[in-house]
């Protein structure tokens, strides 16, 4: 398990005016909170935050320094601008290394591009699982190999690797569906049927025939 690193500074001023001034300096406001822990308002460099967020996601431990004070955290929530690709605010949850905690980790379907049975359609039905463990046992993901799946197969939470790990308690129902494999349905191509217009006389033609 790799701990990522991030430097922060304490933030004394709050409010929209203070936030605008931070944006000019490419700094993002955030907060560190936790159990029996006084929340700390912080600022973090946006480029460094983006880099760590891309690698750590919300399921990896991050060692942070706040004006030299060390904490271990995970990214709990990130707010981004609805139109622009920049961060607006970030929440960090402090993790106590000696205490069991709840985490959310992503589900990964290993070998999804190498499934032997082809053609086939793989449907991922669960993106994340909730687990409980000591921080030192925190995995980056919950994985299952799908290479040998057959038509009609459905993998459940109990098939994930973390479910078999004695150091981890999975909080999801063990029968919750994770993914399924099916045979692609044949597309019914409707041929364009050209309507052959019947040789039906028009009103004027009928009138002409009657006149004759």
Curated annotation (Swiss-Prot):
Signal peptide: none annotated. GO terms for cellular component: cytosolic large ribosomal subunit. Residues 181-212 are annotated as: Disordered. The keyword Ribonucleoprotein applies. One of its GO terms (biological process) is translation. One of its GO terms (molecular function) is structural constituent of ribosome. Residues 188-197 have a biased composition (Acidic residues). InterPro entries: Rbsml_bL25/Gln-tRNA_synth_N, Ribosomal_bL25/Gln-tRNA_synth, Ribosomal_bL25_b-dom, Ribosomal_bL25_C, Ribosomal_bL25_long, Ribosomal_L25_dom, Ribosomal_uL5_bac-type. Keywords: Ribonucleoprotein, Ribosomal protein, RNA-binding, rRNA-binding. Part of the 50S ribosomal subunit; part of the 5S rRNA/L5/L18/L25 subcomplex. Contacts the 5S rRNA. Binds to the 5S rRNA independently of L5 and L18. Belongs to the bacterial ribosomal protein bL25 family. CTC subfamily. This is one of the proteins that binds to the 5S RNA in the ribosome where it forms part of the central protuberance. This is Large ribosomal subunit protein bL25.
């Amino acid at each position: 398990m790799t701990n990522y690193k991030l430097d922060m500074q304490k933030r004394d001023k709050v409010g929209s005016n203070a936030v605008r001034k931070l944006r000019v300096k490419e700094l993002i406001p955030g907060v560190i909170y936790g159990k029996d822990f006084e929340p700390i308002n912080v600022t973090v460099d946006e480029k460094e935050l983006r880099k760590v967020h891309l690698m750590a996601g919300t399921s990896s431990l991050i060692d942070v320094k706040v004006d030299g004070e060390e904490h271990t955290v995970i990214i709990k929530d990130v707010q981004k601008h609805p139109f622009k690709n920049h961060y607006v605010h970030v929440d960090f949850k402090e993790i106590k290394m000696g205490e069991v905690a709840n985490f959310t980790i992503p589900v990964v379907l290993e070998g999804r591009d190498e499934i032997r049975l082809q053609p086939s359609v793989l449907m991922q039905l669960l993106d994340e699982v909730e687990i409980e463990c000591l921080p030192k046992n925190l995995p980056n993901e919950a994985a299952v190999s799908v290479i040998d799946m057959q038509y009609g197969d459905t993998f459940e939470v109990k098939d994930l690797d973390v479910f078999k790990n004695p150091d981890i308690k999975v909080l999801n129902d063990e029968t919750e569906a994770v993914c399924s494999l099916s045979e692609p349905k044949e597309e019914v191509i409707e041929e364009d049927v050209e309507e052959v217009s019947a040789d039906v006389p028009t009103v004027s033609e009928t009138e002409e025939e009657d006149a004759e």
